[in-house]
Amino acid sequence: MDIYRIPRREVPVRILLDDGRTLDGTLFTAETGPGGRPEDVLHYLNESEEGFVPLVCGRDSFLLNKAGIVWVQLAGDPARELAGEALDARHVPARISLAGGISVVGTLAIAMPPERSRVIDFLNAAGRFLPLLGEGTVTLVQCRFVVTVRSGQGAERV
C-alpha cells in the first residue's frame, strides 16, 4: 500500500566497487533529511548504522556493502547541491591515489576552524566518504581506499 511507503528521492550515480566493476544506477535517499532539506548521498553513505545500500541498475537491483564501494560519482542536481554547500570553504586542488592504482583529481572543499584548516586535519576529520569536487561532478571517495593525497596536478579525471 502506497500510504505506508516511505518517500524516497532517486539519485543517479556511478559507483566503482573494490572488485573493479563500475555500476551506473540509482540510489535512494530520504526526501527530508537534517535541516528539512532532501538527504544528500554523502550524508547517506556516512551514516554509520547502515552497512548496506540498495542500488537499482535497470531491471537489476543490488544490496551493496558500503565497505566495498571505492567511490560514488554524482552529476547534475545532486552534484550541484553538494558543491553549493562548499561555496564558503577553502578550495584545495588534490590528486587522490587509490588502492589498485587509480587516481582521481578534483578539489577538496575544506570548511574547518582556522586552527584545523590543513588538508591533513580535513582528512582526519572526514567521515567514511569524503567529497572531491570536479567539473560538474562530485566524487565521494571512501577514505579506506585512499593511499596518497597530493597536489592536483597531472592526474586523469574520473
Can you describe what each PLM-predicted range is?
Residues M1-V158:
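Conserved RNA-binding domains used in RNP assembly and mRNA/RNA metabolism
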